[in-house]
Each structure stands twice: as C-alpha cells, then as structure tokens.
Amino acid sequence: MVIETDLALPDGRTLHVYDTGGPARLTVFWHHGTPNLGAPPGPLLPLAESLGVRWVSHDRPGYGGSTHLPDRTVGNAAECVAAVADALGIGEFAVMGHSGGSSHALATAALLPGRVKAVAVLAAVAPFGAEGWFDGMAAASAASLRAAAEGRAVKEKHEATAEFDPAVFTKADFAALAGSWSWLDDVVRPALGAVGLIDDDLAYVTPWGGDPAAITAPTLLMHGADDRMIPATHSKWLASRIPGAELRLTPGDGHISVLDHAADALTWLAAQDSSASDATTGAM
C-alpha cells in the first residue's frame, strides 16, 4: 500500500509525498520522469517488498500536489529529498530514477554524499553541454529541448502546438507501454499539461547545481542501446564522469523498454546495501 501525504515546507510550499512505509532494510527514493507524477513504480512494488525495500517519492514541484517552483534546477531535487527524509526520520537511503528522473537522482547523490548509499538510474539525461548532447536524438525530442534552451517563452510556445511523434519510441518501447509498463499511463496522463513539464525541460538545459563527478556512492547506469529520445551517449558520458560507475547498455531497448531491466537495477541497489552492511560488520 502506498500512503500519500502533503509535506509543508518552511517557505510555504507543499510537496506531495508517497511512502510505502513499514519496516524496511533499505529506503529507496524514486525520481519520476517527464511528465509523470511521483508515485513509486507499480510494476516494482512486489519485488521491493520481497527485497525489504521501502519506496519514498514525491511529485516534483509543478506536478500533482506539489507547489510550482519557478526556475528550479535539477539539483533542487536534493533539497526536496532531504526535506522529505528529515520529516520521515530517514537518515540514509538509495536513489533510483528513470529518464529525467535519473538526472534528479544523480544530482541528489552528488549533493547529499553523506546520505545517499547507492544510485541506480535508467535512461539518464546528462548535464547540458556534455559533448554531443543532441547527437542521435529523435527530431521531436531535440526540438523540444532546443526550444527550452531558448527560454521559457519559446518553450511555452513550442508546447502549445507540439504533438506526439511516435518516432521517438521503438517497437520495443511500444510493446513495454502496452504490456509490462502499461502502468506508466497512470502517472503520465494526470501530468500532461502541467507546468512541471516546462520546468523540467528548462532545468535539463541549465546547470544542475551539482557535479556528477562528486558522486561517491556506488552507481549503476542502465540505458537502452536504441534509445531515440535520450541516446545512450548520455549515460556513456555520465559513466566517464562518475567515479567507479557501472554502465549497462541493453541491446534492442529504447527509452521505455529499458524499464524491463528495472527489476535488475533494484536488485542491484539492494545488493549494494548488503555489501556495505557486510563490510561494516566485518570491520567491527
């Protein structure tokens, strides 16, 4: 069961929080994609329970029940996570995300090195300005982000007339959307038209406010080798930047079908926590 609450922040804003609660061996903060609501990934709930994982997440500002925060950065996610963790009495935790949510997870790890124990991300977006950032991107995806790079007014004008282009997805993506990850429809539809979508894209093309090179936690980067929305070169760049990061490219997968490997990523997170616990015990 997922419990939903609203957290009042000191500046008067609200964060809408999701929490599976209960005793857990590891807490994982989920960072949602664009545009999504923040509910933890339904297809992974049974596995999480078997692994002893507690999911905690929130709607990013401008989505769902979370107050809009103009000009937020990707790094702002660390402030949100810290506020939620403090309110729930959680000290250390792992982070996980998909697509743009992966970037927010990585920034959280970079900015909260003393609290983030491990990182697993899928189809991550590299910081803007990374070499070849637009290379290999589907035309519609590139046009949307180029509009964001021109500023809010241009991005808003673009969104007013933009239509979905099926070329951004592969056959494997559509199969995942119709089957194993049809759950995404539950979190995407309520987020369409939200100001959070524009804020997200503006954040992706501005400095994060945190350097991936500062990440000290074990990090797993998974990316579909055939991703047309955010090409795998983004995760390759991140892997070259994050100390000790593990890169797994999944052949034949696109931006959505890479989620068929999310269970492996979650299992990997739990294993990192076990390894850290074993090392600590052995040192005592």
Give the positions of each predicted feature.
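Alpha/beta-hydrolase
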Residues: 136-210
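The serine-hydrolase catalytic nucleophile loop
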Residues: 33-46
